[in-house]
UniProtKB/Swiss-Prot annotation:
PANTHER family: TRANSLATION INITIATION FACTOR IF-1, CHLOROPLASTIC. One of its GO terms (molecular function) is rRNA binding. The keyword Cell cycle does not apply. Keywords: Cytoplasm, Initiation factor, Protein biosynthesis, RNA-binding, rRNA-binding. This is Translation initiation factor IF-1. Belongs to the IF-1 family. It comes from Salinibacter ruber (strain DSM 13855 / M31). InterPro entries: NA-bd_OB-fold, RNA-binding_domain_S1_IF1, S1_domain, TIF_IF1. One of its GO terms (cellular component) is cytosol. Component of the 30S ribosomal translation pre-initiation complex which assembles on the 30S ribosome in the order IF-2 and IF-3, IF-1 and N-formylmethionyl-tRNA(fMet); mRNA recruitment can occur at any time during PIC assembly. One of the essential components for the initiation of protein synthesis. Stabilizes the binding of IF-2 and IF-3 on the 30S subunit to which N-formylmethionyl-tRNA(fMet) subsequently binds. Helps modulate mRNA selection, yielding the 30S pre-initiation complex (PIC). Upon addition of the 50S ribosomal subunit IF-1, IF-2 and IF-3 are released leaving the mature 70S translation initiation complex. Its main location: cytoplasm.
Length: 73
C-alpha cells in the first residue's frame, strides 16, 4: 500500500505553546495544532506569533500538522 500524500496549506501562527507547538490559523479559517519539524529544530529556526508558515497535514488527522517552512517577511 502506498503512503498517502501530505496536504500542504499556508497559515499564520496565532499562539506559541510549550514543546515547540503552535496554534496555527489556516487560510480557510480552520485552527490546527502545528508542531515544528525536526529540520527546523536542528537549524534553530525560530517561530513567533504572527509569522506566516507552510504546514503539512496528514489526510487522516486534519487537526494536527507539521510546520515545514517559515516565510520571509
Amino acid at each position: 500500500m502506498a503512503k498517502e500524500e501530505a496536504i500542504e496549506k499556508d497559515g499564520e501562527v496565532i499562539e506559541a505553546l510549550p514543546n515547540a507547538q503552535f496554534r496555527v490559523r489556516l487560510e480557510n479559517g480552520h485552527e490546527i495544532l502545528g508542531l515544528l519539524s525536526g529540520k527546523m529544530r536542528m537549524n534553530y529556526i525560530k517561530i513567533l506569533p504572527g509569522d506566516r508558515v507552510k504546514v503539512e497535514m496528514s489526510p487522516y488527522d486534519l487537526s494536527k500538522g507539521r510546520i515545514v517552512y517559515r516565510y520571509k517577511n
